[in-house]
Regions:
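Extended ligand-binding clefts on enzyme/binding-domain cores
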Residues: 93-100, 116, 122-238
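Terminal, non-catalytic domain-edge segments
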Residues: 41-42, 46-49, 74-84, 195-378, ...
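Boundary/linker segments of alpha-helical solenoid repeat arrays
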Residues: 12-19, 166-172, 227, 268-276
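Extended ligand-binding groove/face enriched in aromatic
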Residues: 2-127, 133, 172-175
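Short beta-strand segments within Ig-like beta-sandwich modules, predominantly Fibronectin type-III
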Residues: 389-391
């Protein structure tokens, strides 16, 4: 495991005096043209940090360790296994190696955040609220799983930086939102309110009130809530996908319906692959595969119910780790359409779909594990009692099935855990602007860019 940019982009960018004007207009402070590194150049080795060989242990590189912990936490939540609690190696500068665990990473990140109230930086000199909000999600889920309290740094950071990172007029209306902040020169690089969508999506499970404020302001600026205004396709659909996901999460049915209809027409959703068993959004790019990040964001509005994204982090289903579970499915020859426990009926419901015509109707097996009492087991297949199963241990059974479409109802006697995850606190805020707004000074340097000229941000307007 390693971070290529951190290992190779040493010192200032040698090409920073050659950036094209279009790029300068978007990303470089006006008073430092030719003397300032573009976003994306990490500049490992510059002062005051010096060369830091460890991508995780470094003061910067937040976009590596923050996202890494988020992915690791999601992996643990999915599998129920503390995989990253064991030591893993991280590649460093000059072929050095560093041993880390997820738990040490979280302690390090939380400590860094506590010491730097403006937030740890990504590239040297640049703090990104977008990345910090994703890093906060990782801490939030980590705390829920391991019953820790590292996430407290996030709401404290939001309140501490709100009046510096965001621009409000005298009435409290949002005028601009942050892209990055450079603490060495006290410079905010900002865009209009619609840029807030990128932060709102990751902020909503952590600070739903301010996240919704960012979302509503962006929607109004873009005109998505105006049924008389046409929604137009832009070159970059990322923010429209984020808007759709946010609309669903916040229960904004007007915007959700409008953006969903737009996505159906312009995102090119279609099935593909053998027997059309795969699905993706192709965005009319005429490419071999769907774009990964774009398609994944677009799918956020297709899975789960309204509020599911926030509940994943604020009220995760930890009881599932002790619930009866389906294992041993011959994927991808058999697809799992449904597998869930109903604690009220003490029943595990399973729907399987055959996906390989060559193996159609031939025999195979599945396993059900973590059954509390084998003496109470009853199995139904397609609505009828089914006895082609046997115990394989004190809490597991093996069921004979075939490569065909099957519905199983398995009475297990499991009625739910007595205690679920306790991480269910709601951050309540009555005002969008901190009462201490006169304490945090405004930045000495501010540049508000016109994102309508950016090829990757044109869907955002100003």
């Amino acid at each position: 495991m390693g971070c290529y940019d951190w290992l190779t982009q040493i010192g200032p960018d040698p090409n920073r005096d050659k950036y094209p004007q279009e790029w300068i207009d978007l990303w470089i402070p006006d008073h430092l043209v030719g003397k300032y590194d573009t976003p994306g150049w990490v500049a490992n080795g510059i002062e005051p940090w010096g060369l830091q060989k460890d991508p995780i242990g470094a003061d910067g590189n937040l976009f590596f360790k923050g996202w890494l912990n988020l992915i690791q936490s999601l992996h643990v939540y999915t599998t129920g296994e503390d995989t990253w609690g064991s030591s893993f190696q991280v590649a460093g500068v000059d072929r050095s190696k560093f041993d880390w665990t997820q738990h040490r990473l979280v302690e390090h990140l939380s400590s860094q955040w506590t010491k730097n109230r403006m937030g740890p930086h990504c590239e040297n000199t640049k703090i990104w609220p977008y990345c910090l909000s994703a890093a906060g999600l990782g801490l939030q889920l980590y705390d829920a799983i391991f019953q820790k309290n590292t996430h407290s740094v996030y709401p404290e950071w939001v309140e501490h930086t709100k009046d510096k990172y965001y621009g409000f007029d005298s009435s409290g209306a949002l005028e601009w939102t942050p892209i990055y902040y450079d603490p060495l020169i006290d410079h905010i690089h900002a865009a209009g309110p619609s840029n807030g969508l990128t932060i709102a999506f990751y902020m909503m499970p952590q600070d739903p009130v301010f996240a919704e404020f960012l979302y509503r302001t962006a929607v109004k600026k873009l005109g998505w809530d105006n049924i008389n205004k046409e929604i137009k396709m832009k070159p970059e659909p990322r923010f429209m996908a984020l808007g759709l996901a946010c609309a669903k999460e916040f229960g904004d049915t007007t915007v959700e319906m409008r953006l969903r209809a737009f996505a159906e027409e312009h995102f090119e959703p279609r099935w593909f692959g053998e027997n059309n068993k795969n699905f993706g959004y192709w965005f009319n790019l005429n490419e071999k595969w769907p774009r990964g990040q774009w398609a994944a964001l677009a799918m956020m509005a297709e899975v789960g119910k309204s509020g599911a994204w926030s509940n994943l982090f604020r009220n995760p289903n930890l009881e599932k780790f002790n619930a009866p579970s389906l294992e041993g499915v011959d994927f991808p020859n058999i697809l799992v359409n449904q597998a869930f426990n109903d604690p009220n009926r003490q029943t595990l419901y399973i729907k399987l779909k055959a996906a390989n015509k060559i193996k159609e109707n031939s025999p195979t097996k599945i396993f059900i594990k973590k059954i509390p009492d084998l003496s109470s087991i009853k199995v139904k297949r397609d609505g009828y009692l089914y006895d082609m199963w046997r115990a394989t241990g004190k809490s597991s059974i093996e069921i004979d099935i075939s490569y065909s479409d099957i519905e199983l109802e398995i009475y297990t006697g499991w009625s739910g855990a007595k205690k679920r995850g306790e991480f269910n606190k709601v951050i309540k805020k009555d005002n969008f602007i901190s009462e201490s707004s006169n304490i945090m000074q405004r930045p000495r340097s501010l540049k508000i860019i016109n994102t309508s000229t950016c090829p990757c941000c044109t869907s955002m307007g100003n």
